[in-house]
Amino acid sequence: MAKRIQFRAHGGPEVLEYVDYQPAEPGPQQVRVSNKAIGLNFIDTYYRSGLYAPPALPSGVGAEGAGIVEAVGSEVTRFKVGDRVAYGSGPLGAYSDVHVLPEANLVHLPDAISFETAAGVMLKGLTVQYLLRQTYELKGGETILFHAAAGGVGLLACQWAKALGVKLIGTVSSKAKADLAKAHGAWETIDYSHENVAQRVLELTDGKKVPVVYDGVGKDTWPASLDSVAPRGLLVSFGNASGAVEGVNLGILAAKGSLYVTRPTLATYANNAENLQRMADELFGMITSGKLKVDISQRYSLADAAKAQTELSARRTTGSTVLLP
């Protein structure tokens, strides 16, 4: 028997259970992975709370991890037993000793990158890759606004933007987080606990605003995001850390300057094995070249997943958090 985290009903972290389970044999196009490290992400809390609907209850949790292939299905061609692999997408159930998932969801993990680093960077790093390199392809020289700059995604974005020659303005909730974001490459920071975000963006851009805002916070930052985008600019809403944006009046986009809004997902960009591996290879290259440093700032045992999610939701974490089986 193996161990996993599951929930039988939606609710707070207290609904998470640490239970015994029997991992399935891989189907023809599936791979069974012995997890060595598991990533913790806000999206995990969305499924637990009921904001997103899992396929069924009881449900596993998590979609990011890294480990070693221990079994492959009869039609699997890209992986063999013993391969080092990483993944950053479903099915749910990564919070486990052993996880079975489609071959197409896995990437080869270079020896130079540890399991903890991979588990702490796959979903967040691939998110930054598509945000900065595809959703709005930054060329260098732009000034952008990125909310929650001291979080796991934010710290990677700070570094990647700097490597591209982009000035990233990051929003934070404290001086300590401002210092952390700047240490990772943020050009300027705005402390939203006592500063007016949109007003500071105007000041920092000489009244021009920014061509793109990246907003993974959601409800709390939506108004400031709209007020920070330059006319005909793009607001990239990629997360709901503070709650979902609801009741949007499309007329506001006209009033604010013919704005564009997109709600991208990793699944759309990494829509096949080739695109996923290409994106991962660029991410891994940024890490091995030293341009991207992955901060594993918190480590919890798998059994303490509820505590880890509590800290994440309370915004008491920085960088990446991993669970260790």
Region roles according to the model:
Residues 22-39, 49-93:
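Glycine-rich beta-strand-centered segment in the early N-terminal region that forms part
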Residues 87-150, 160:
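NAD(P)H dinucleotide-binding glycine-rich loop of Rossmann-like/cofactor-binding domains
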Residues 153:
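Hydrophobic/small residue at the entry helix of a nucleotide-binding pocket
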Residues 163-221, 272-274:
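Adenosine-nucleotide cofactor-binding segment
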Residues 164, 172, 220-291, 325:
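Glycine-rich phosphate-binding loop and adjacent beta-alpha segment
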Residues 273-325:
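C-terminal hydrophobic helical "lid"/dimerization subdomain
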